[in-house]
Amino acid sequence: MNNFLKSSLMAVTAFAATASFANDREVLQLAQVSDGFNAEQKYMASCFACHSTGAAGAPKVGAGMMSEWEPRLEKGLDAVVANAVNGVNAMPAKGLCFDCNEDDIRALVEYMLETSQ
């Protein structure tokens, strides 16, 4: 990406970050654009295999599946993210997202939660 586009993207991102958004999903989408991380694409590549089917006890993702997540969320979002980062039960550390950092994992968890409303 050339410097002009980078500068423009950074300026738009800075302005948009101070604007009022209709919901948190828009903020998440902006963050994905600004750092090149796309939670939906990464979910499909790294999380879908287990979380779409509930394999090995993974909480399912999809409309109306929040009840699968609620027992895990009783400990708080940070605990859910920590479990995803460190691994829990049959899930290995970072699931199958070996190139994800902790912020990426948090974005993936938030994406799965939003998708499960």
What do the PLM-derived regions correspond to, one by one?
Residues 37-49:
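Local sequence-structure signature of Cys/Sec-based thiol-disulfide redox active-site neighborhoods
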Residues 16, 22, 41-44, 85, ...:
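Processing junctions and N-termini across compartments
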Residues 58, 83-106, 112-115:
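Axial heme c-ligation environment in periplasmic c-type cytochrome domains
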Residues 1-37, 116-117:
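N-terminal export/targeting leaders of redox proteins
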Residues 51-80:
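Gly/Gly-Pro-rich "capping" loops immediately C-terminal to redox-active cysteine motifs
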Residues 47-53, 108:
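The canonical Cys-X-X-Cys-His
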